[in-house]
């Protein structure tokens, strides 16, 4: 009578806690399934230990002697280990140089080329210094007084050696050959040298005197050649300026 008196609403309220508990248990079970499935899959791929049960071998008894049964087991084999995959290494990774190091190497190379030019200049200067002789010549300016006395009006004797002096004057040189005599010895530093320096003012006068002397000598030689019995076939004549 009491069961008939319960309405469907009251019956649903009584069963509601059981339904909620059942749903909660199912949800918890569903959450645990993926973790257990992952562990089972990894164990199936990488087995930790495989136990192989060897077959039992029985030895028959002999009639003469009685021995207990002896069971022999084959040696256990270690499970084959699967290779562990490794991450691929990049090719040529060790040969690459960082950009900062390359930039520093380029800078050092440019600096080395720039430093070579001053070194070459120094080498050239050293070579030029080596080319100079050991002794140095001291050049006096034109304004400084000459240490050698200047002979302006010296008697010029008629001597064939004066032809060489005329040639030297024509070549614009600053010295004149003087014959060995008392006057020339006094004029040439007490006879230590055979020539004296001539100033620029006295050069035209000496040139005129030497030219007149050489022309007179040439005329005398021509007269002697005409008067002589054996005359040379040819004769070199110096053109006088």
UniProtKB/Swiss-Prot annotation:
Residues 97-115 have a biased composition (Polar residues). The keyword Ribonucleoprotein does not apply. The chain crosses the membrane at residues 5-28. The modification Phosphoserine is found at residues 41, 44, 87, 104, 109, 112, 199, 212, 215. GO terms for cellular component: cell-cell junction; COP9 signalosome; immunological synapse; membrane; plasma membrane. It is found in: Cell membrane. Residues 1-4 are extracellular. Pfam families: LAT. A lipid is attached at residues 27, 30 (S-palmitoyl cysteine). One of its GO terms (molecular function) is signaling adaptor activity. Keywords: Adaptive immunity, Cell membrane, Immunity, Lipoprotein, Mast cell degranulation, Membrane, Palmitate, Phosphoprotein, Signal-anchor, Transmembrane, Transmembrane helix, Ubl conjugation. Phosphorylated on tyrosines by ZAP70 upon TCR activation, or by SYK upon other immunoreceptor activation; which leads to the recruitment of multiple signaling molecules. Is one of the most prominently tyrosine-phosphorylated proteins detected following TCR engagement. May be dephosphorylated by PTPRJ. Residues 29-241 are cytoplasmic. GO terms for biological process: adaptive immune response; calcium-mediated signaling; gene expression; homeostasis of number of cells; immune response; inflammatory response; integrin-mediated signaling pathway; intracellular signal transduction. Residues 124-133, 217-233 have a biased composition (Acidic residues). Residues 136-139 are annotated as: Interaction with PLCG1. It is a single-pass type III membrane protein. Residues 175-178, 195-198 are annotated as: Interaction with GRB2, GRAP2 and PIK3R1. Residues 78-139, 209-241 are annotated as: Disordered. The modification Phosphotyrosine is found at residues 175, 234. Expressed in NK cells. Present in lymph node, spleen and thymus (at protein level). Required for TCR (T-cell antigen receptor)- and pre-TCR-mediated signaling, both in mature T-cells and during their development. Involved in FCGR3 (low affinity immunoglobulin gamma Fc region receptor III)-mediated signaling in natural killer cells and FCER1 (high affinity immunoglobulin epsilon receptor)-mediated signaling in mast cells. When phosphorylated, interacts directly with the PIK3R1 subunit of phosphoinositide 3-kinase and the SH2 domains of GRB2, GRAP, GRAP2, PLCG1 and PLCG2. Interacts indirectly with CBL, SOS, VAV, and LCP2. Interacts with SHB, SKAP2 and CLNK. Interacts with FCGR1A. Interacts with GRB2, PLCG1 and THEMIS upon TCR activation in thymocytes. Interacts with THEMIS2. Engagement of killer inhibitory receptors (KIR) disrupts the interaction of PLCG1 with LAT and blocks target cell-induced activation of PLC, maybe by inducing the dephosphorylation of LAT. This is Linker for activation of T-cells family member 1. It comes from Rattus norvegicus (Rat). The lineage of its organism: Eukaryota, Metazoa, Chordata, Craniata, Vertebrata.
